[in-house]
């Protein structure tokens, strides 16, 4: 996917980028590739692949959750890594307020460099594990949206994310081909953590790769014991 393809595909989906935003994506790509030479950020480094599989893919969630485009919503991105999906969303929709969480200091330093270089505001970067931060009153049940892009199966992701979502907010699940079965397997965990599946969307990227976006509504407060201590959700998922 070239720059032009990226701009055109987004335009077809109702997302129009300004010249400044196009430049910000270009600079983001340059920083990603340069830093990736000494910090493990991504296995995807070809420009056309980064634009498709990181930038475009990150923005697909706003095609199905329209409020991300136009409101000053708050979004927390768990295990953000190199900033996906939250930084592409922030670049495309500047009013969105984002919080990025990652456990690796080197990645946090990279994210700060991107935020500073692109002169982004309304961004907080938190170094730590979701299980610890999810028990912090500053962050707990304080966000309109939480997302995590393919960092674990849905039953585990739910424990990482739903404690951050306020009642009436949403957990946005972004997944590849195994998503539907994961959602079925994760129903008990979602319910126990206060979530309820609202909708599931299946679509393909411009290259034909299948993707799922699942929208989980936060209906009730998450019990205080969740998230459990660091490492437990992945070792002993709620089932």
Swiss-Prot record:
GO molecular function ontology, one term from the record: rRNA (guanine-N7-)-methyltransferase activity
InterPro entries: rRNA_ssu_MeTfrase_G (IPR003682), SAM-dependent_MTases_sf (IPR029063)
Keywords: Cytoplasm, Methyltransferase, rRNA processing, S-adenosyl-L-methionine, Transferase
SUPFAM superfamilies in the cross-refs: S-adenosyl-L-methionine-dependent methyltransferases
Recorded superkingdom: Bacteria
Cellular component annotations (GO), alphabetically ordered: cytosol
Subcellular location as annotated: Cytoplasm
Main EC class the enzyme belongs to: transferase
Role, per record: Specifically methylates the N7 position of a guanine in 16S rRNA.
Similarity comment: Belongs to the methyltransferase superfamily. RNA methyltransferase RsmG family.
UniProt name for this protein: Ribosomal RNA small subunit methyltransferase G
Lineage summary: Bacteria, Bacillati, Bacillota, Bacilli, Lactobacillales
Gene that this sequence comes from: rsmG
